[in-house]
Protein backbone atom coordinates (compact mmCIF):
# COMPACT_ATOMS: atom_id res chain seq x y z
CA UNK A 1 0.00 0.00 0.00
CA UNK A 2 1.28 3.41 -0.86
CA UNK A 3 2.10 5.53 2.19
CA UNK A 4 -0.47 8.03 0.92
CA UNK A 5 -3.37 5.70 1.84
CA UNK A 6 -4.64 5.50 5.40
CA UNK A 7 -6.81 2.42 4.73
CA UNK A 8 -6.03 -0.83 2.91
CA UNK A 9 -9.64 -0.91 1.71
CA UNK A 10 -13.08 0.65 2.07
CA UNK A 11 -16.03 -1.76 2.28
CA UNK A 12 -19.15 -0.54 0.43
CA UNK A 13 -22.31 -2.41 1.37
CA UNK A 14 -26.04 -2.12 1.87
CA UNK A 15 -26.90 -1.92 5.55
CA UNK A 16 -28.93 -5.08 5.03
CA UNK A 17 -25.51 -6.77 4.74
CA UNK A 18 -23.98 -5.03 7.77
CA UNK A 19 -23.30 -8.32 9.57
CA UNK A 20 -21.45 -9.71 6.54
CA UNK A 21 -19.49 -6.47 6.15
CA UNK A 22 -18.45 -6.60 9.80
CA UNK A 23 -17.35 -10.24 9.41
CA UNK A 24 -15.33 -9.39 6.28
CA UNK A 25 -13.63 -6.47 8.00
CA UNK A 26 -12.65 -8.60 11.03
CA UNK A 27 -11.46 -11.44 8.77
CA UNK A 28 -9.30 -9.21 6.57
CA UNK A 29 -7.81 -7.26 9.47
CA UNK A 30 -6.85 -10.45 11.33
CA UNK A 31 -5.53 -12.27 8.23
CA UNK A 32 -1.80 -12.95 8.25
CA UNK A 33 -0.30 -12.86 4.79
CA UNK A 34 1.92 -15.90 4.09
CA UNK A 35 5.56 -15.08 4.84
CA UNK A 36 6.72 -15.98 1.34
CA UNK A 37 4.44 -13.26 -0.11
CA UNK A 38 5.30 -10.44 2.31
CA UNK A 39 7.34 -7.74 0.64
CA UNK A 40 6.78 -9.04 -2.88
CA UNK A 41 6.32 -6.13 -5.29
CA UNK A 42 2.99 -5.68 -7.06
CA UNK A 43 1.61 -2.85 -9.17
CA UNK A 44 0.01 -1.55 -5.96
CA UNK A 45 3.26 -1.66 -3.98
CA UNK A 46 4.82 -4.31 -1.76
CA UNK A 47 2.58 -6.94 -0.13
CA UNK A 48 2.16 -6.11 3.58
CA UNK A 49 2.23 -8.47 6.56
CA UNK A 50 -1.33 -7.51 7.51
CA UNK A 51 -4.36 -6.08 5.69
CA UNK A 52 -5.02 -3.39 8.27
CA UNK A 53 -6.88 -1.06 8.64
CA UNK A 54 -10.08 -1.60 6.64
CA UNK A 55 -12.71 1.17 6.63
CA UNK A 56 -16.36 0.28 7.21
CA UNK A 57 -18.92 2.90 8.12
CA UNK A 58 -20.71 1.90 11.28
CA UNK A 59 -23.84 4.02 11.11
CA UNK A 60 -26.63 4.63 8.64
CA UNK A 61 -25.88 7.58 6.41
CA UNK A 62 -28.00 10.60 7.23
CA UNK A 63 -30.88 11.39 4.91
CA UNK A 64 -28.94 13.87 2.82
CA UNK A 65 -28.19 14.08 -0.88
CA UNK A 66 -24.44 13.57 -0.48
CA UNK A 67 -22.06 11.18 1.23
CA UNK A 68 -20.56 13.61 3.69
CA UNK A 69 -16.96 14.60 4.32
CA UNK A 70 -16.02 11.64 6.56
CA UNK A 71 -17.06 9.04 3.97
CA UNK A 72 -15.52 10.98 1.06
CA UNK A 73 -12.28 11.35 3.02
CA UNK A 74 -12.22 7.62 3.77
CA UNK A 75 -12.75 6.85 0.06
CA UNK A 76 -9.88 9.19 -0.89
CA UNK A 77 -7.64 7.56 1.71
CA UNK A 78 -8.40 3.94 0.76
CA UNK A 79 -6.16 1.89 -1.50
CA UNK A 80 -9.02 -0.37 -2.67
CA UNK A 81 -12.82 -0.50 -2.66
CA UNK A 82 -14.51 -3.80 -1.80
CA UNK A 83 -18.15 -3.83 -2.91
CA UNK A 84 -20.47 -6.39 -1.28
CA UNK A 85 -22.76 -7.06 -4.24
CA UNK A 86 -26.40 -7.99 -3.70
CA UNK A 87 -29.78 -6.85 -5.03
CA UNK A 88 -30.12 -4.45 -2.09
CA UNK A 89 -26.64 -3.02 -2.72
CA UNK A 90 -27.49 -2.51 -6.40
CA UNK A 91 -30.53 -0.46 -5.33
CA UNK A 92 -28.66 1.55 -2.68
CA UNK A 93 -27.99 5.14 -3.70
CA UNK A 94 -25.18 5.23 -1.12
CA UNK A 95 -23.34 2.15 -2.41
CA UNK A 96 -23.63 3.45 -5.97
CA UNK A 97 -22.39 6.89 -4.90
CA UNK A 98 -19.42 5.38 -3.04
CA UNK A 99 -18.48 3.47 -6.20
CA UNK A 100 -18.91 6.59 -8.36
CA UNK A 101 -16.75 8.73 -6.06
CA UNK A 102 -14.03 6.06 -5.75
CA UNK A 103 -13.84 5.62 -9.52
CA UNK A 104 -13.77 9.42 -10.02
CA UNK A 105 -10.58 9.45 -7.94
CA UNK A 106 -8.86 7.47 -10.72
CA UNK A 107 -8.94 4.17 -8.86
CA UNK A 108 -11.38 2.16 -11.03
CA UNK A 109 -8.74 -0.58 -11.31
CA UNK A 110 -8.82 -0.99 -7.52
CA UNK A 111 -12.50 -2.01 -7.19
CA UNK A 112 -13.06 -5.56 -5.95
CA UNK A 113 -16.52 -7.14 -6.10
CA UNK A 114 -17.74 -9.82 -3.71
CA UNK A 115 -21.04 -11.29 -4.92
CA UNK A 116 -23.20 -12.21 -1.93
CA UNK A 117 -26.44 -12.97 -3.76
CA UNK A 118 -28.16 -12.38 -7.07
CA UNK A 119 -26.92 -12.86 -10.61
CA UNK A 120 -24.20 -10.54 -11.95
CA UNK A 121 -25.86 -10.07 -15.35
CA UNK A 122 -29.36 -9.27 -14.02
CA UNK A 123 -28.62 -5.57 -13.54
CA UNK A 124 -27.36 -5.36 -17.12
CA UNK A 125 -30.64 -6.55 -18.68
Residues covered by each model-derived region:
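Switch/connector loops and helix/strand junctions flanking conserved nucleotide-binding motifs
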Residues: 20-21, 64, 90-93, 119-125
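Short, charged, amphipathic alpha-helix that recurs within catalytic cores of restriction-modification
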Residues: 94-103
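Conserved N-terminal substructure of TIR/SEFIR domains
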Residues: 1-84, 103-109, 117
Amino acid sequence: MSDSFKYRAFIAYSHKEAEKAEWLQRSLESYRVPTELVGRETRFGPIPKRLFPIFRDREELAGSAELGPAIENALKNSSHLIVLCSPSAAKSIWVNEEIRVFKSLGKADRVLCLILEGEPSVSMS
